[in-house]
């Protein structure tokens, strides 16, 4: 139930503050959650979500392909949010819907604010960026800048995000007393469900390097 306090939540397992997305960015509901409540939700426009069947009358990628700005290559043909068809169906919560192009700025800003507010005490910050997960929709600052299509552009955006966090630590003179860990939950995947020309625009880039496999595999590159 996204219309009231969400249970369970990260405070239940020891976090003091949370600003998260409920699923992955290619899944509904496309909203932010702050301290167990959907950000900007109008109680008169409640959210309904279902992964088994359509709810509401919002356009879908399957029924309204003319309404999408990013076409699916596999799956990803359910409710259209911000011109992008997602996994699952939702309706309601219009005032709370995110704009994909702004997600990196918003999450990075929240992380910087957290660091600044805890600069005088020990803190633990877990920041999970949406890049380079699909849909790959960079902010206009990065769109078209990599020469490798949207996938390359969001890698640039991710690099900017990391730089912003590092610069914040440096500006507060706490970088030398901070352990910074950068890691991924899985290896690379090129075409992950949207027609974003990731394969066509690799331009010699080999994300897996000399390792076997990739995301969804049990080999080294997975």
Regions found by a protein language model. Name each.
Residues 2-13, 134-154, 167, 171-222:
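Histidine-centered active-site microenvironments of extracellular/periplasmic hydrolases
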Residues 1-93, 209-212:
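Catalytic-site neighborhoods of secreted/periplasmic enzymes
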